[in-house]
Design a protein with these regions (language model features):
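Conserved, mostly hydrophobic/aromatic
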Residues: 3, 90
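Extended, alpha-helix-rich binding/interface surfaces that flank or overlap catalytic cores
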Residues: 10
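Alpha-helical scaffolding segments of alpha/beta enzyme cores, especially the outer helices
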Residues: 20-27, 49-53, 108, 112
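Glycine-enriched alpha-helix->loop->beta-strand junction motifs that scaffold or abut catalytic
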Residues: 34, 56-63, 81-87
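Short Gly/Pro-enriched loop/turn and capping motifs at secondary-structure junctions
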Residues: 45-49, 69-73, 92-94
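C-terminal helical cap(s) of enzyme catalytic domains, especially alpha/beta-barrels
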Residues: 96-118
Length: 123
């Protein structure tokens, strides 16, 4: 299964709310049957590394970062501060693509976005 809990990145109490959400996720993981794993899709946390414990949890297959609310550059910069999280930035891949681009420009634009997002995922 994939779980996608989100906390509003513009909320005034974001840091506190993300910590409460993390505690709830950790409690849920304890309740999972042995041998079952989940994938988590989470907004990039305000506190760098907040979800680090989840990335190594035996019941977590992957922790995927959502870029919602951030520009691609900002999302990549924030993701790079969170080792173990990988990007799920579909908007970031597509935002600079245009129907009017010729094949070479389209391919170059897509490649540049992929390179930027991949680099942030392995930082």
């Amino acid at each position: 299964p994939m779980l996608e809990p989100e906390y509003d990145i513009t909320a005034a109490d974001r840091a506190e709310g993300e910590k409460i959400m993390l505690e709830a996720i950790e409690e849920g993981l304890v309740a999972l049957p042995e041998g079952q794993q989940v994938m988590l899709k989470l907004s990039i946390p305000k506190e760098a590394g907040l979800y680090g414990g989840l990335t190594n949890h035996p019941k977590v297959l992957r922790v995927v970062a959502l870029s919602g609310g951030y520009s691609t550059d900002d999302a990549c910069r924030e993701l790079a501060k969170n080792p173990g999280m990988i990007a799920s930035f579909s908007r970031g891949l597509l935002q600079d693509l245009r129907a009017a681009q010729d094949d070479a420009e389209f391919d170059a634009t897509l490649s540049a976005a992929m390179d930027k997002i991949q680099a942030a995922s392995v930082a």
